Amino acid sequence: MSTTTNEAVTDVAAQRKAAVQALLADARTIIDEKGVTREALAAISARLLELATHRALFDSADFPPPQRDSGDTSTRYRLNPGEDGFALYLNSLLPGKTTIPHNHDTWAAIAAIDGAELNRIYRRTDDGRDPERAKIELAQEVVVRPGVPIAFLSDDIHSIHVGGAEPTLHFHLYGRPLETLTGRLGFETDTGLIVRYNATHMQRATQAVG
């Protein structure tokens, strides 16, 4: 790799880090001023949409999905590794990626750089008294794509479904790092069982980029 190429790569990495830190600073200010509310998450989502326009800083070549024959359907990149509190990830998903309905145990905001992801949003219809079982029903569907974000409070429930032929590249910003979310719940629609989502369904590996 030539000196000029090395300098260009270093420059992009520095610009990316600065853009990430600016986003996180803005998100902290929004939460400090508005609290954890849907209004605050809408403002954070708008800020994430702006970050997603800086495509040269988040090129899919630098954040590739898994190989199609690997057996995996997602790669998660942590953009502010080692930091406590807010955690920004870039998720690269292959077509065919799905999840069971789950909550997050913290707030979340999601915005797309590339690709479309169907989000099915659910509501609980039981009284919540049984810690092992729940009844949920589909309330809404939202296709997250460039220009169309989505956000969730900690108890909101959704599932994701990636169709089509092309991978996705989406920002996911959380109030706390995913690996710390021990109260995150998954909901098995066929049995009604509630499961610990991180323990049973979350891909543990995260690549640090920062």
Could you say what each language-model-derived stretch is?
Residues 124-157, 195-196:
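Short acidic-glycine-tyrosine-enriched beta hairpin
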Residues 100-101, 119-120, 152, 158-163:
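Short beta-strand His + acidic residue motifs that chelate non-heme Fe in jelly-roll/DSBH
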Residues 82-86, 98-109:
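A short beta-loop-beta micro-motif enriched in histidine and acidic residues
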Residues 105-123:
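Glycine- and acidic-residue-biased ligand/ion/polar-headgroup-sensing regions
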Residues 65-95:
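A short glycine-rich, His/Asp/Glu-containing loop-to-beta-strand
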Residues 89-103, 153-155:
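Conserved short histidine dyad/triad with adjacent acidic residue
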Residues 1-56:
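N-terminal leader/capping segments at the start of a protein or of a new domain
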Residues 109-111, 165-181:
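A short hydrophobic beta-strand segment most commonly corresponding to one strand
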